């Protein structure tokens, strides 16, 4: 009888531990890839934007050297382009087509790969266009042309 009771108690503890393991995500499951962190930054840009249409990732610059700590801010540089989807639709930007002659923005800043910590520090500036076959990024009256 005592063995049966101990076995039943052990079974309950095993069940509780199993449920706890399923509920508490592991640290590795909480880490985002570099691209996922950038897509999260694009989502944040769309949430905070007052513009009519959503933006979608157009180009992602090379990720920085590997860093084991997902909570450490990583430098990031990417380009987004305006889509045909109105912002209020809340449609995932990846499902939206790019708008012909839509606005293009160059974004720089830092992201973390940790899903729990969510510090993003991103600044986006509109790309003013192409000058003599070169892509130019302008901020106020100062432009940098590449290419």
UniProtKB/Swiss-Prot annotation:
Residues annotated as signal peptide? 1-29
Which species?
Sus scrofa (Pig)
Tell me the function of this protein: Microbicidal activity. Active against E.coli, Listeria monocytogenes and C.albicans, in vitro.
Q: InterPro entries annotated for this entry?
A: Cathelicidin-like, Cathelicidin_CS, Cystatin_sf
The record's subcellular locations are:
Secreted
The pro-peptide lies at: 30-130
Protein name (record): Protegrin-2
Q: Looking at the UniProt record for this protein, which Gene Ontology cellular component terms does it annotate, in alphabetical order?
A: extracellular space
């Amino acid at each position: 009888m005592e063995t049966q009771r101990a076995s039943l108690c052990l079974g309950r503890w095993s069940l509780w531990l199993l449920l706890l393991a399923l509920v508490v995500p592991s640290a590795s499951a909480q880490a985002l890839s570099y691209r996922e962190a950038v897509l999260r930054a694009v989502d944040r840009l769309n949430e905070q934007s007052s513009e009519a249409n959503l933006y979608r990732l157009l180009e992602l610059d090379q990720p920085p050297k590997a860093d084991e700590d997902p909570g450490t801010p990583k430098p990031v540089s990417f380009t987004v382009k305006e889509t045909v989807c109105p912002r209020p639709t809340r449609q995932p930007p990846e499902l939206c087509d790019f708008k012909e002659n839509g606005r293009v923005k160059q974004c720089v800043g830092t992201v973390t790969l940790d899903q729990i910590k969510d510090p993003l520090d991103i600044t986006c500036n509109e790309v003013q266009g192409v000058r003599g076959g070169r892509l130019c990024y302008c901020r106020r009256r100062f432009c940098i042309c590449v290419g």
